[in-house]
């Protein structure tokens, strides 16, 4: 029987035409409204260079940000979605703080059923539900809770400091990211999920293996993420999940079993899970956190702490490692703290370390863990003219604006010599600078990252013990200058973070015994600083 191909061809052409129209119908959006906009490629939009891995996502954000340097805001296309990128700092402050009620939400993940770990977490929640959950979680980050979690962090960090200082002579060249993610994994496991793991001794533990899979945004994971966020109808049609079901089930089962065990045995721990358990029956009818809700909140805490914080520590260690004067000044401050505290750093002492604070904040400025963040308009808001003499623009409900964090923090108008690592920018008052309108790493206003104090403390404690015990020296594999990875949308180094790890020689002739998994070694002792070793 002869097949009539014409109806099939016509149907295919029609589908392609409809899809093309759907992808390109918005590309006159900014031209109609008189707003300057960044060039685009049909379907891929203005971020095509990042999607095709020509440049990193951070560099894409910076290029868009710099395209119209005199404009308060500019347009660009996230695939086919028109987005207004806000450049003016006062306008950003107005949007995120004073007029927060116009922009209270992020674009949500249209995947609550497929991906509850993303769809139900605090970052994705909107409106009253976001307020309820944030108010529930906020007590987890009070000073008293942070002080309790600091003790857990310190024990993990001391073990990693000892591990670094006792590497065999033929294994002292190390890529930092692997070790740092193991540390953040162990800290989050105990502080959020209430379980103890040791990823140095057991690098194949399920918590670490599944956590690494869930938070590692390589090429395929990043594409899935952007499709779910920017093309939800495609995600629905293809049933795309960001997190593999087996991984999501592992974390949910872990939370369910932990809660059941605590209820049955009367176990109480100072962690986020305990805090959520204690809200049961107190939030009102239909508002209690389900096991799925609790897992989603614990997971987003894990997601931010595991990948983002480990990356922050890598960039900070990289800059300290390649800047000898910075390393010496930091180690002098660390040595003084250890001397004052009789070898056991306290929560208060680490919080009062001005130079360590400055190193962390300068690292966050140069390498923000999130290079851009969105806000969704829920009621019309008038933007001033983008240039003098131009018309104002009214952002309508369901339209989206972007905060170009990487662009702002690399702008010489905001930070002179922006590509130079200079902790002294933040030395005078680091805590005040963390909330400044030009340092958006953790956001600004009510939607500011709830876990920012935890993330900074987690990074500070590890860096404290690494540099107390070791010097980081550039090696043949150290990438100078650093090149950002083009694969995926997470900010990291293209060639890893390679350094030679050298135990510090504080006083010749004295040694201390260090025990690490599988062996005992002797290294030169740091006098009167680690009496517990």
Model-assigned labels for residue ranges:
Residues 1-16, 76-84, 144-155, 165-190, ...:
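Cytochrome P450
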Residues 2-118, 123-132, 152-162, 198, ...:
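N-terminal membrane-proximal hinge/A-helix region immediately C-terminal to the signal-anchor transmembrane segment
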Residues 18, 50, 83, 207-284, ...:
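Cytochrome P450 catalytic core segment centered on helix I
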Residues 48-49, 142-144, 184, 243-312, ...:
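Conserved cytochrome P450 catalytic core segment spanning the I/J/K helices
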Residues 50-70, 253, 257, 343-389:
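Conserved cytochrome P450 K-helix E-x-x-R motif and the immediately C-terminal K′/meander segment
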Residues 121, 139, 390-392, 402, ...:
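Cytochrome P450 heme-thiolate "Cys pocket" and heme-binding signature region
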Residues 324-327, 452-492, 502:
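Cytochrome P450 heme-binding "Cys pocket" and the immediately downstream C-terminal segment
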Residues 372, 403-430, 514-522:
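Conserved cytochrome P450 K-helix/beta-meander segment immediately N-terminal to the heme-binding cysteine loop
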């Amino acid at each position: 029987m002869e097949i009539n191909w014409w109806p099939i061809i016509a149907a295919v052409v029609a589908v392609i035409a409809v899809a093309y129209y759907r992808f390109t119908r918005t590309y006159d959006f900014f031209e109609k409204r008189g707003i300057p906009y960044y060039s685009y490629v049909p379907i891929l939009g203005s971020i095509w260079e990042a999607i095709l891995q020509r440049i990193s996502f951070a560099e894409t954000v910076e290029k868009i940000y710099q395209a119209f340097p005199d404009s308060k805001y500019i347009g660009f296309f996230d695939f086919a979605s028109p987005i207004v990128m806000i450049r003016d700092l006062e306008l950003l402050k107005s949007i995120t703080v004073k007029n927060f009620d116009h922009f209270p939400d992020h674009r949500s993940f249209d995947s609550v059923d497929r991906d509850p770990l993303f769809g139900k977490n605090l970052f994705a929640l909107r409106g009253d539900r976001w307020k309820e959950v944030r108010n529930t979680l906020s007590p987890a980050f009070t000073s008293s809770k942070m002080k309790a979690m600091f003790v857990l962090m310190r024990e993990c960090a001391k073990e990693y400091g000892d591990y670094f200082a006792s590497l065999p002579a033929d294994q002292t060249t190390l890529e930092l990211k692997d070790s740092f993610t193991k540390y953040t994994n162990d800290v989050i496991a105990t502080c959020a999920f209430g379980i103890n793991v040791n990823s140095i001794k057991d690098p194949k533990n399920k918590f670490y293996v599944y956590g690494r899979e869930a938070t590692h945004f390589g090429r395929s994971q990043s594409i899935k993420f952007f499709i779910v966020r920017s093309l939800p109808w495609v995600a629905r049609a293809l049933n795309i999940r960001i997190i593999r079901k087996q991984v999501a089930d592992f974390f949910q089962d872990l939370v369910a079993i932990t809660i059941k065990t605590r209820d049955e045995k009367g176990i109480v721990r100072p962690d986020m899970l305990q805090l959520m358990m204690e809200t049961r029956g107190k939030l009102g009818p239909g508002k209690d956190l389900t096991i799925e809700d609790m897992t989603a909140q614990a997971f987003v805490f894990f997601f931010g702490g595991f990948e983002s914080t480990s990356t922050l520590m890598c960039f900070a260690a990289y800059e300290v490692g390649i800047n000898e004067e910075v390393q010496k000044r930091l180690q002098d401050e660390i040595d003084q703290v250890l001397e004052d505290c009789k070898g056991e750093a306290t929560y208060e002492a680490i919080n009062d370390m001005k130079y360590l604070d400055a190193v962390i904040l300068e690292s966050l400025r140069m390498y923000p863990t999130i290079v851009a963040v969105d806000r969704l308009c829920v009621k019309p808001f008038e933007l001033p003219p983008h240039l003098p003499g131009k018309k104002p623009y009214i952002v309508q409900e369901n339209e989206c604006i972007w905060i170009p964090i990487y662009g702002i923090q690399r702008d010489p108008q905001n930070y002179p010599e922006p590509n130079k690592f200079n902790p002294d920018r933040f030395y005078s008052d680091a805590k005040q600078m963390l909330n400044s309108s030009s340092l958006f790493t953790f956001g600004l206003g009510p939607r500011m990252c709830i876990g920012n104090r935890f993330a900074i403390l987690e990074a500070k404690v590890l860096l404290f013990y690494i540099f107390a015990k070791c010097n980081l020296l550039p090696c043949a594999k150290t990438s100078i200058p650093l090149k950002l990875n083009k694969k995926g949308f997470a900010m990291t180094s293209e060639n890893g973070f390679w350094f030679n790890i050298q135990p510090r020689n504080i006083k010749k002739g004295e040694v201390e015994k260090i025990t690490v998994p599988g062996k005992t070694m002797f290294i030169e002792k740091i006098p009167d600083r680690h009496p517990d070793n």
